[in-house]
C-alpha cells in the first residue's frame, strides 16, 4: 500500500528439518520505498541445513529475525512461527488492507505450553501512512517480538513507548500505543546479526502493561 510492501507466510506444510521456514501467518517481509527493509524473516532456529552454502555464527547472541508472538516456559520457546493450524483472513476497508491472523503458540513439534492450547489473534492494517500491528489480548507471559533491521552505524533512539531510526534523510518510527517497549539481549554493538538473510537488527519486545493485555504498534516513515 503506497510506499509499503509486505509478505505474509501462510504455509501449512513443513520441511524435513523442523523449525526452519516461518509459517503461522508471520510477517515475512516489510519494506518501504525510502526506508528500505524494516523486517526480513530468518530461519526460526538457525541451523546449517546447507552447511557448504552457509556460515556459522561466532557472535554471543543469535535469534530469529521474524516478527512473532513469543512465550518461553522452562527453556522451551513457543511462538506462532511453527503453527500449522493458522488461519489468515484478508479484507479491504477504506483503501486499507486488513489481515487477521488466528494462530497458536507452539514449539517446533507442534506442542503447546504446559497449560494447554494458547490461541492468539493478531491484526495487521496497511495504509499509505504505515503499518499497524495489534494484539487485542496477549496471552499470559507472552509478548510481541519486533526485530527491527538497523545497521550498527545507524542512530537509534529507544524509549518505553517508541523507537526512532534516522535513515535515508528521514526517520523510521515505531510507536507503541499500548504496551511497553523493551530491548532483548544484544551483542556489544547493540544489535543481533543473523547470517540468513544477513541483516543486523534491534530485538524489540513489546510487553502488555494493562489489564486487557492489549499490544498496539504503529510503524511509519517520514
Model region roles, listed by residue range:
Residues 1-154, 158-168:
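Extended polysaccharide-engagement surfaces of secreted carbohydrate-active enzymes
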Residues 168, 175-222:
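Beta-strand-rich recognition/accessory modules
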Amino acid at each position: 500500500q503506497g510506499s509499503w510492501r509486505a509478505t505474509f507466510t501462510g504455509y501449512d506444510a513443513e520441511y524435513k528439518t523442523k523449525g526452519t521456514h516461518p509459517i503461522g501467518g508471520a510477517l515475512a517481509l516489510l519494506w518501504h520505498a525510502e526506508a528500505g527493509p524494516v523486517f526480513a524473516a530468518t530461519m526460526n532456529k538457525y541451523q546449517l541445513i546447507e552447511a557448504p552454502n552457509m556460515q556459522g555464527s561466532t557472535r554471543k547472541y543469535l535469534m530469529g529475525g521474524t516478527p512473532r508472538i513469543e512465550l518461553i516456559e522452562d527453556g522451551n520457546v513457543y511462538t506462532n512461527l511453527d503453527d500449522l493450524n493458522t488461519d489468515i483472513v484478508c479484507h479491504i476497508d477504506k483503501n486499507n488492507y486488513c489481515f487477521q491472523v488466528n494462530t497458536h503458540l507452539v514449539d517446533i513439534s507442534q506442542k503447546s505450553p504446559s497449560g494447554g492450547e494458547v490461541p492468539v489473534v493478531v491484526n495487521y492494517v496497511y495504509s499509505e501512512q504505515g503499518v499497524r500491528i495489534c494484539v487485542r489480548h496477549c496471552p499470559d507471559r507472552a509478548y510481541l517480538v519486533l526485530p527491527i533491521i538497523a545497521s550498527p552505524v545507524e542512530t537509534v533512539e529507544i524509549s518505553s513507548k517508541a523507537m526512532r531510526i534516522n535513515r535515508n534523510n528521514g526517520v523510521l518510527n515505531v510507536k507503541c500505543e499500548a504496551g511497553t517497549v523493551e530491548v532483548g539481549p544484544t551483542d556489544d554493538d547493540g544489535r543481533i546479526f543473523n547470517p540468513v538473510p544477513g541483516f543486523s537488527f534491534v530485538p524489540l519486545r513489546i510487553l502488555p502493561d494493562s489489564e486487557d493485555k492489549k499490544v498496539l504498534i504503529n510503524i511509519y516513515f517520514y
